[in-house]
């Protein structure tokens, strides 16, 4: 309803994401661009499976109009090393996602601001494990999958997400 996500379901905050990114991701879910071994991906894939193009477009437009909100966080977020997370983010993420985390549509890089750390950690792991970015039509996903291999340690990934969640929006 609010688009700010649901931690219990593992659903991400959709507010603040660009219309083009939302459209690409929903189309990708429908086209099978993501490995659906996890409950969240299966849920999303089945939720949009029967939507026609007009319904998908209407959903994208409605999501894009939602006011930007910060996602709720868990206590685990505070456990990351923010200084190390900032250094890693600057070195490996900022060229595409921007120094302030707001993304770059021209590069296909979404805004990370407002996403919760659990979601970011899970999605990053999916790229590292080849569960995202494997489909030949997912140009930007393949790019992220290649780049994700630079940082594979779960503790370092957590440090990056801990840094990102504290960025202002």
Model-derived features with residue positions:
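Axial heme c-ligation environment in periplasmic c-type cytochrome domains
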Residues: 7-13, 29-59, 63, 73-75, ...
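Active-site substrate-binding loop specific to GH73 endo-beta-N-acetylglucosaminidase modules
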Residues: 26
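Small disulfide-bonded, cysteine-rich extracellular recognition modules and tandem repeats
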Residues: 17, 47, 96-99, 115, ...
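Sequence/structural segment immediately N-terminal to covalent heme-attachment motifs in c-type
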Residues: 1-4, 77-102
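Short, electropositive, low-hydrophobicity segments enriched in small/polar residues
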Residues: 7-9, 20, 89, 102-107, ...
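Activation segment of ePK-like protein kinases, specifically the conserved APE
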Residues: 3, 34, 68, 101, ...
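Sequence context surrounding c-type heme c attachment/ligation sites in exported
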Residues: 15, 19, 23, 86-90, ...
